[in-house]
A protein has these predicted regions:
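Histidine-centered catalytic micro-motifs
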Residues: 266
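Bacterial Sec-dependent N-terminal signal peptides
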Residues: 1-20
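Active-site His/acidic residue clusters
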Residues: 269-288
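Non-catalytic accessory regions flanking glycosidase/transglycosidase catalytic cores in CAZymes
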Residues: 18-247, 254-263, 294, 298-510
Length: 510
């Protein structure tokens, strides 16, 4: 029997109709959007290479001695792109990589740093990019550091010494060592991940069951807080789903770490939830995968809400989706999926407070033939959210035609959210048309006490052919198309959304 998908605050389960309406209710605030939902993630992933190695860190991002490198050896083109996107935070150094990582290998004179075998991905790690380099990169971007601790093969002493190195002013062995290496001022790293994918027993080094993980995480948090009481923690939620134990893992983590950690993480890559027989089907990709992504968020929220009811005296956990990515497709289909992930974060602004897109380098495209970097439609779609949707998120629902995909019914073709700018002066309504072939005409209205004011509204749209390949040669065509649309006297906007497109309306707030 199929599950009936209820997109809470998104759609009404109606029969297919000819008329589609997007209703925004600015009287119903979902929550304040945390800018950290637009964070990114990086880890060095190589494949059985001997030095000199090249992976998504060494080569593209860290490229000393090349024309694009800044004084610290990082690609200035990426730094400029991340600054334009206003990237708020970067999670590093892993990922699976961190389960075999010793942070002390990555400090001190570079010619004295050891080369290690990468236990997670194969190949070798030269440790030329370590703590001081990552911090310098984030300083150049203007982003926060989110350090993921090694609670796989690592130990708690190593974790607390890492915090001592980054956060203590002076007077201890590791804080003085940091100063000796040229960094007298502490980095004051605020966010610390309590391990990575420790539930993933088929792949992770140092796998633990949920009970053992909670015990280690509690002690690690206790140790780091003794070093710096201002730090915040991200508990390791589910990343392994096939055996069906993910919900039980999350339940135990929520029960054990509520009041200790500040966030619980989940990892979800867009195509991972699809059966291989449907993985290449268009509507499975934009429908079933989207519903699965929403379902994972709502399932964890339900567990957190239960714990809140049982222990109202404890600080509730918030969600960090600190690995996500719309992989498994190319071109505009990939962009649609990424935008749907971001729409989900906005839609659940009361609960999703942190995110980390995987990998950060995917936000700036590179042409395989020419080696040139350029801004693809995905860059511009990300920018629509990260620079605009920063205020409050509002209840938004769609009535209109729907479709079925996998075990899910009543998925609306239009996926819509509404959020204000950081200053509250503009309401951004972001709409994704998931229909493979058809444009959809819809009315947009504010059903709150203040209807949209009559006048012209700016519109930005991203679209493209499903078979189109993004290239450097076509880079000038990828910026959003800009237009205006009229708000009628009755406060409605009528607009026709192109098939497989992303559209954002910038509506002045009265």
């Amino acid at each position: 029997m199929k599950k009936l998908l209820s997109f809470i605050c998104l759609c009404l389960p109606l029969l297919a109709t000819a008329q589609t309406t997007i209703s925004v209710n600015t009287d119903r605030v979902i929550g304040k959007i945390d800018k950290n939902i637009y964070g990114v993630f990086m880890e060095p992933i190589g494949r059985d290479q001997e030095p000199p190695i090249e992976n998504n860190v060494y080569g593209p991002l860290y490229c000393p001695g090349t024309p694009n490198a800044n004084a610290d050896g990082f690609n200035q083109l990426y730094i400029d792109a991340f600054r334009e996107l206003q990237i708020p935070a970067m999670r590093w150094p892993g990922g699976n990589y961190v389960a075999g990582y010793n942070w002390e290998d990555g400090i001190g004179p570079k010619d004295q740093r050891p080369v290690r075998k990468d236990l997670a991905w194969g190949g070798y790690e030269t440790n030329q990019v370590g703590t001081d380099e990552w911090v310098a990169l984030n300083k150049a971007i203007g982003s926060e550091n989110i350090i993921c601790l090694n609670l796989g093969l690592g130990d708690i002493n190593s974790a607390r010494f890492w915090c001592e190195y980054t956060n203590v002013d002076h007077g201890t062995y590791y804080s003085d060592l940091r100063a000796k290496y040229g960094h007298p001022e502490p980095y004051k790293v605020k966010y610390w991940g309590l391990g990575n994918e420790v539930d993933g027993y088929p792949w992770i080094m140092g796998h633990k069951n949920a009970d053992d993980y909670v015990k280690v995480a509690i002690e690690a948090a206790k140790a780091l807080r003794a070093v710096d009481r201002s730090v915040q923690f991200v508990a390791n939620g589910s990343a392994y789903y096939p055996d069906g134990t993910w919900a039980e893992w999350n339940r135990k983590v929520v029960e054990g770490l509520t009041g200790i950690a500040h966030y619980i993480s989940i990892h979800r890559y867009w195509r991972d939830g699809l059966d291989e027989s449907r993985a290449d089907d268009y509507y499975s990709y934009v429908g079933e995968a989207a519903a699965d992504f929403e379902e994972k968020i709502m399932s964890v929220k339900a567990q957190v809400d239960i714990q809140k009811a049982l222990h109202p005296e404890k600080r509730s956990l918030m969600l960090s989706v600190d690995e996500w990515g719309a992989h498994g497709a190319a071109g505009i289909k990939n962009v649609l999926a990424g935008a749907m992930c971001l729409n989900s974060f906005v839609r659940h602004a009361d609960f999703v407070k942190m995110g980390a897109y995987t990998m950060a380098t995917g936000l700036l495209a590179s042409d395989r033939e020419s080696g040139q970097y350029y801004k693809s439609p995905w860059f511009y779609a990300y920018k629509m959210f990260s620079t605009n949707c920063l205020g409050e998120s509002f209840d938004t629902y769609v009535s209109g035609d729907t479709f079925s995909s996998g075990p899910y019914d009543n998925i609306p073709y239009l996926d819509a959210t509404a959020a204000t700018s950081e200053d509250g002066k503009t309401l951004f309504v972001t709409v994704i048309n998931r229909h493979e072939k058809d444009a959809i005409k819809a009315d947009i209205q504010n059903v709150g006490k203040n209807a949209f004011a009559a006048g012209r509204v700016n519109v930005s749209s991203i679209e493209g052919g499903l078979d189109d390949t993004f290239t450097y040669a076509k880079r000038d065509s990828y910026a959003p198309k800009e237009s205006t649309v009229n708000v009628a006297r009755d406060g409605k906007i009528t607009y026709t959304f192109p098939a497989h497109s992303i559209t954002q309306f910038a509506i002045p707030v009265k």
